[in-house]
């Protein structure tokens, strides 16, 4: 079969390597310039390519696999929309596992997929997690697994026509990626396609945006984050008490994730008590409400993964008193920040802003009378936060914006924050 790959990012690069090894004809179309190493590899493998443009030549292929980053209204693709596919769609069509669980949502996707995989592994069940989680879906090609856990983005769902999913889960829908999607409705309907693709669709019935745009189907099953709450040594889920001592999973966002996970395992007829016993050993993920250090009674938390206002709102929900010094930064996604400003007024004592976020929030912060400081960079922000802090305060990096204004990704941003906190501790010891 003849494949055109539009965009040569992580997912399509992995797919290209698999497809060429299977004997398929490949044409790669990419707006950026290829490196000499990439061109050499293309030549060695007999792969035709174009760079600096996406021409009509892509329409000559039998299948056009669109990278998640390629815009939905790309003019070259409008002429051959009937041939467009996502990488996940191609992978599932070629490699049919026994059972596929797919997860999407504005927040909590990666953690939820990690929780599912963790339980399967601890039970000795053959499983594999891939997709938007960091491991390309194409990596699963060539071997069978009993349980395939997929993290799927709104972009991948938009480009997908049909996915064969056993259980599909929509965790939540909050305004996000509105620099790509033209409206919240467009974004929400892309997410909700997952329920249409699934034998059993699980959705958050407490999420207003899901309930606004969802279509009633007989295959749907609801989970309700309002029916789970933490108690001192456990949780109460759907009216039943369970011993559970993992404090990381008892934070605001993770209780929502846990509610979805328990609904999945309930649908699969797993013993929920056993599932929770396993999850007590689950360790926190990097850059998600990650404890960094405590210096002179001031706690530093790294939540660099919070790349939208909804994620930062959720992070702030973990604090009951206004003892948070919040670091905001990054590139906006065409969001309305009114809800974020309201949450900051309730939860934070001071805001420090740097990067492109300064121009987005300066006027709103000024009008809201929230104490704020504009900083040049991460190092100055950390130093200023500690300077104005008091014992018992929390310095929280939860940026509410994408990292690409100053960093390659949210991981690099989070590591920079960690290093600046280490530098601060070192200076205090001098």
UniProtKB/Swiss-Prot annotation:
Kindly list the biological process annotations in GO that this record carries.
Answer: cell division; cell wall organization; peptidoglycan biosynthetic process; regulation of cell shape
Q: Any S-S bridges, and between which cysteines?
A: none
Tell me the pathway.
Cell wall biogenesis; peptidoglycan biosynthesis
SUPFAM superfamilies the UniProt entry points to: MurCD N-terminal domain, MurD-like peptide ligases, catalytic domain, MurD-like peptide ligases, peptide-binding domain
Listed A to Z, the keywords are:
ATP-binding, Cell cycle, Cell division, Cell shape, Cell wall biogenesis/degradation, Cytoplasm, Ligase, Nucleotide-binding, Peptidoglycan synthesis
The reaction(s) catalysed by this protein are: UDP-N-acetyl-alpha-D-muramoyl-L-alanine + D-glutamate + ATP = UDP-N-acetyl-alpha-D-muramoyl-L-alanyl-D-glutamate + ADP + phosphate + H(+)
Q: Which residues bind ATP?
A: 105-111
The protein's GO terms of the molecular function aspect are:
ATP binding; UDP-N-acetylmuramoylalanine-D-glutamate ligase activity
A GO-annotated cellular component = cytoplasm
**InterPro entries named in the record:** Mur-like_cat_sf (IPR036565), Mur_ligase_C (IPR004101), Mur_ligase_C_dom_sf (IPR036615), Mur_ligase_cen (IPR013221), MurD (IPR005762)
Highest rank taxon of the organism: Bacteria
Pfam families referenced in this protein's UniProt entry, alphabetically: Mur_ligase_C, Mur_ligase_M, MurD_N
E.C. designation(s): 6.3.2.9
| Compartments it resides in | Cytoplasm
What function does this protein fulfil?
A: Cell wall formation. Catalyzes the addition of glutamate to the nucleotide precursor UDP-N-acetylmuramoyl-L-alanine (UMA).
PANTHER family, from UniProt?
Answer: UDP-N-ACETYLMURAMOYLALANINE--D-GLUTAMATE LIGASE
Q: What family does the database annotate?
A: Belongs to the MurCDEF family.
Supply the NCBIfam families for this chain: murD
Protein name listed in UniProt: UDP-N-acetylmuramoylalanine--D-glutamate ligase
Q: Which organism is it from?
A: Pseudothermotoga lettingae (strain ATCC BAA-301 / DSM 14385 / NBRC 107922 / TMO) (Thermotoga lettingae)
Q: Which gene does this sequence derive from? A: murD
